[in-house]
């Protein structure tokens, strides 16, 4: 094992012991936010420390077996050779496991997320496609046992959405969908096309983690302009009677969010504030990443909304992810919510990139 990797593992073990002590201190136990944060860090380090202990055990076995190989007794030497080979094999397996465990974790992988889909070029067909994408993600969420809450929607004239914003609530939601941000392109014959010509349309998808209480940016009420208006869309007669929909404008950044799904203005405001916090958090994260200007450009982790990431070709039943040259001929299943065959290769590629970066250190 490389000395740099060994040094890092020793540091993780020391931090793990430190956390064990901190979590038993009364002042930490009484501080819920700090206790929760330290407990999460402890649980993240535990599998690394356990694997490192197994590695150290295998290393000790290998050292002992090599000492035994010096014994004059040929039977003992033969047995020692077998033990040394077994220990060396275990070491190799455990080193790879430890490298994977040391890959920096995305602290937001456990988070809920905000999903924003906007129709791009293509007019009515783009709005219909945006609706298809929202249905695809909603079905995937249902299959995962997540909740889907629509915060805001602007319907297309012939179906679908000009824009739809939703909150997806579920363990690990962000970890599964974080690579969906970008431009999605569709190639198909629109229902309104009488000549049977294939049209190309697009929609943009943005996936933002919902920041927790500790990391959510503080929003100064003086920095907000609050507008109320009457909700549009489904909801019966009630929608025309009260100004329950909320639009928040964050004056320093110009970011605008809306929420109109709840009948209560108070609930709409709370949801809009949560969405605004996520957008401000995302903007700050993007700024920090730009400042760091990483030398290794990630293939799948950039999250640039303008980047064309995927093409859905309906005549051929083909879906292509351009970031990793993935092509699947199971478009119907994917559009019906079977997204894992697309998501898993992206996650694996991202992990391989991080593993390569770790090996280069």
Swiss-Prot record:
SMART domains: PCRF. The keyword Membrane does not apply. InterPro entries: PCRF, Pep_chain_release_fac_I, Pep_chain_release_fac_I_sf, Prokaryotic/Mito_RF, RF-1. Its main location: cytoplasm. Keywords: Cytoplasm, Methylation, Protein biosynthesis. It is found in: Cytoplasm. One of its GO terms (molecular function) is translation release factor activity, codon specific. This is Peptide chain release factor 1. It comes from Thioalkalivibrio sulfidiphilus (strain HL-EbGR7).
């Amino acid at each position: 094992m490389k000395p740099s990797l060994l040094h890092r593992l020793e540091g993780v073990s020391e931090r793990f012991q430190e956390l064990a002590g901190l979590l038993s201190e009364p002042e930490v136990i009484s501080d819920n936010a700090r206790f929760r944060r330290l407990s999460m860090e402890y649980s993240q380090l535990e599998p690394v420390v356990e694997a490192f202990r197994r590695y150290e055990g295998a290393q000790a076995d290998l050292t002992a077996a090599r000492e035994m190989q010096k014994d004059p007794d040929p039977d003992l030497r033969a047995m020692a050779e077998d033990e040394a080979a077994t220990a060396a094999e275990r070491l190799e397996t455990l080193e790879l496991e430890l490298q994977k465990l040391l890959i920096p974790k995305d602290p937001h992988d456990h988070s809920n997320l905000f999903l924003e889909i906007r129709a791009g070029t293509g007019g009515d067909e783009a709005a219909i496609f945006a609706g298809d994408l929202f249905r695809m993600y909603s079905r995937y969420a249902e299959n995962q046992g997540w909740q889907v809450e629509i915060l805001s929607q602007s319907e297309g004239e012939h179906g679908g959405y000009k824009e739809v914003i939703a909150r997806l609530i579920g363990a690990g939601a962000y970890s599964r969908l974080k690579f969906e941000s970008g431009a999605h392109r569709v190639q198909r014959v629109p229902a309104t096309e009488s000549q049977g010509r294939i049209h190309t349309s697009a929609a943009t998808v943005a996936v933002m983690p919902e920041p927790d209480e500790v990391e959510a940016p503080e929003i100064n009420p003086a920095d907000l302009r609050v507008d109320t208006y009457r909700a549009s869309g489904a909801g019966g007669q009630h929608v025309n009677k009260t100004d329950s929909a909320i639009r928040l404008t964050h004056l320093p950044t110009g970011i605008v969010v809306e929420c109109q799904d709840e009948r209560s203005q108070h609930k709409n405001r709370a949801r809009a504030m949560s969405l605004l916090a996520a957008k401000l958090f995302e903007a700050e994260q993007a700024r920090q990443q730009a400042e760091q200007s990483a030398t290794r450009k990630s293939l799948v982790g950039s999250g640039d909304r303008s980047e064309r990431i995927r093409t859905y070709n309906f005549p051929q039943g083909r879906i292509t992810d351009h970031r990793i040259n993935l092509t699947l001929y199971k478009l119907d299943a994917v559009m019906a919510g079977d997204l894992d065959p697309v998501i898993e290769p992206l996650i694996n590629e991202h992990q391989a990139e991080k593993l390569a970066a770790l090996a280069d250190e």
